[in-house]
Amino acid sequence: MVPKPDGSRRLCIDYRNLNDCTLDASWPMPNISAMLQRIGSQKPRIFGTMDLTQGYHQAPLTMQTRAFTSFIVFCGVYQFTRLPFGLKRAPSYFQEVMATFVLAGLIHITCEMYIDDCNVFGQNTEEFIARLKQIFERFRKCHIFLKASKCFFGYTEIDFVG
């Protein structure tokens, strides 16, 4: 268990051996400069940023993949049913799930997503709220939860991916 900045703890599994024989990610990670250019080209005036609660743990694993995440503790053998930290392809897989399933058709238009950070923007209040509603509806349907203390809405500028 590794302590997190907020005082809670994170279970960490050493997946180095698995990662050594895992193929490189097939889904590309977003280019931050390109994301910022896309946002800027829409000339937004209102911004919001959302942080997913334990982002990776909200992405389900296939039955085949679960076996590879097995780990042993004093009371038994367990495997993850959701994406754990430490896997070589975890960032890419999570990004793919968000882009092709959860927020399909919204990324690059309504919002930008980088791992578990979602940035929404609009030229005016009405557009911003309409976009937020679209994103919230997708998150609701897909059972994606946000960390309220890390969500900020209605700002004229925000920190994103940093």
Language-model features and meaning:
Residues M1-G162:
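Retroelement reverse transcriptase polymerase core
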